[in-house]
């Protein structure tokens, strides 16, 4: 019998002046509508809405109702919690993904909002406008690429592979490798795929969209140390300044399973990012290559939907 498959979705219940969806949220809903057939294959979808104001029933119900309309699945469950600006997606990932390592389930973890958090950036001038458009398509290209080959992903995960993610190829396409363990992907992924990726600095580890085989992941990490924790202080360290653009929270919490020396090497990786802060962000971000061909059509989409 195949593993059951669940989708855990983190949603930011962001405060707003009027009770309506913003442009980013509308865009995400529009994308999910296109994937209704694939979405119906999930055994369960769990949506956790991290509210800026947990008591705001009107906003919670708006988000719940609008998201429900596009999630054509036999079992959809919603939950709300208080958003924590420091921990961000941790409020969802820790409890509903990380703490379930070892279960006989395949989990697709994603963010609802994607990378562009404010549609007003599309009214800005170049190059920032290009940058944010690229980021959006990088996110949704991965998202759609994962769901459209649902059976292929299942074959990989049910075969005992523990992590399924994405890398940018030099020919501007997305490659979807899998790894025997999270540790090997985090520490060796760059080396293994260095001939495929455009820039060794642009390592893409599991982040906003990733599949996990929770049972196989526990087996791959069976030698986990007794006491190795990434505490709130380290979360804060990674959340400050522009480094938050490069560090995925999902990656941080799975670091609990790494040896102390490995955590030091990850800290060094963060330090290396400090050295390139002066480099223009869009010059090093991989999405600009992956998504270049989509820019004109996305501009058209924004105009047609009155977002710009």
Question: Where in this protein do the model-derived segments appear?
Answer:
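ER/Golgi luminal nucleotide-sugar-dependent glycosyltransferases, focusing on the catalytic module
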Residues: 1-308
């Amino acid at each position: 019998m195949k593993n059951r498959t669940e989708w855990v979705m983190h949603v930011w219940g962001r405060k707003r002046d009027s009770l309506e969806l913003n442009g980013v949220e509308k865009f995400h809903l529009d994308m999910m509508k296109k994937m209704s057939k694939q979405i119906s294959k999930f055994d369960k979808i769990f949506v956790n809405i991290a509210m800026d104001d947990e008591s705001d029933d009107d906003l919670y119900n708006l988000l719940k109702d609008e998201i429900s309309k596009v999630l054509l699945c036999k079992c959809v469950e919603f939950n709300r919690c208080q958003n924590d600006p420091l921990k961000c997606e941790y409020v969802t990932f820790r409890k509903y993904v990380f703490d379930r390592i070892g279960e006989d389930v395949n989990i697709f973890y994603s963010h609802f909002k994607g990378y562009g958090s404010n549609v007003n950036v599309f009214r800005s001038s170049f190059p920032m406008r290009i940058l944010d458009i690229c980021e959006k398509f990088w996110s949704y290209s991965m998202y759609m690429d994962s769901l459209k080959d649902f059976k292929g992903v299942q074959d990989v995960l049910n075969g005992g592979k523990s992590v399924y993610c994405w890398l940018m190829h030099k020919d501007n396409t997305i490659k979807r490798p899998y790894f025997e363990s999270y540790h090997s992907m985090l520490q060796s992924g760059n080396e293994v795929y260095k001939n495929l990726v455009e820039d060794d600095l642009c390592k893409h580890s599991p982040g906003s969209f990733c599949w996990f085989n929770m049972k196989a992941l526990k087996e791959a990490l069976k030698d986990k140390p007794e006491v190795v924790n990434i505490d709130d202080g380290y979360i804060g360290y990674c959340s400050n300044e522009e480094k938050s653009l490069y560090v995925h929270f999902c990656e941080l919490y799975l670091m609990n399973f790494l040896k102390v020396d490995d955590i030091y090497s990850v800290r060094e990786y963060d330090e290396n990012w400090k050295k390139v802060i002066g480099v223009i962000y869009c010059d090093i971000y991989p999405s600009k290559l992956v998504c270049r061909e989509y820019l004109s059509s996305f501009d058209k989409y924004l105009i047609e939907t009155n977002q710009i």
